[in-house]
Amino acid sequence: MAKKKCGLLIKTAVAGIAAGAVYSVIGNILVENLLGKKSIKALIAQGGLMPSEESACFYTSDEALKGIEFYRKKVYEKLFTFNKHGECLHSIYYRNEGSHIYAISCHGFTGDPSQNNIYARRFYEMGYNVLLPYLRGHGKSEHYYCTMGWLDRLDIIDWINYIIEKDSEAKIILHGASMGAVTVMNATGESLPENVICCIEDCGFTSLWEQYSVQMKAMTKIPPEIILKTANPIIKSKLGFDINDNSPLEQVKKSKTPTLFIHGDKDSTVPFYMNYPLYQNAKCEKERLVVEGATHAAAGYVYPEIYWDAVTKFINKYI
């Protein structure tokens, strides 16, 4: 009987180790295939992660075409600065001579600064200087891994300081859509200079754990918590942070930066329900805009009048 029990324990242990090894492989695949620069390039070449019927407005709407034309014709500068680790950060910059107002607009996952040309055009025509940074793991970024807006928050603070060093009178607006929204929300949870006057976040998630859980439930029958718990040590090792750290929900609780929370009510990529907890838990001055009928990150493309009316009125309160 003792031998049978011992054998059963050994079999159970071996099965557990085998399962753990499988999940570890899955965790590695998750990190490399979702967050590695090589895979992100491949995703971009395939048209990104969103269904084509939802992403079409990014290329064919009137607002998109105006943004593309702006990007093609308007002269921009290529800027770079260094973070405290000596790593080079890259951005493109539209200069508005004589203006002391700056909009830092952050792109989404599988995007780059050109993805934000519709926002750049609008901010520029409002008379602002516009800085569009490359987020980690994307384009000219010298970081191999994407951190989904977490370590990027520190890069944004470096860009804020870069602007202030050049212009002590600077008034800075933070803006981002999707992962870019996560980036700017995460930044507002840190100690920011008074030069940062407000933040506009468009369809950011509550936490990386919750966002990945939502996506995995749609992709696999394996419980998301098993994959994420297995992937977390790999994320810690390769990216340098715990997946639970990336929580805009916790960051906005510490924020003192007035924030406009925007979300389309037909968003299934970053579910619409995530918007309200972010708004509700923010300790800063805040407003909320729900854009009816808008899918993920599409509000500014398909309902520009509603979008920019709210954004302009919000910014004008703090300039």
Q: Which residues make up each language-model segment?
A:
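Short alpha-helix in the alpha/beta-hydrolase fold that links the catalytic acid
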Residues: 248, 257, 271-280
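Short beta-strand/loop motif that positions the catalytic acidic residue
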Residues: 254-256, 261-263, 267
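Catalytic active-site module of serine/aspartate enzymes centered on a nucleophile-bearing elbow/loop
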Residues: 294, 302-319
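An N-terminal hydrophobic leader/cap segment in hydrolases
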Residues: 12-82
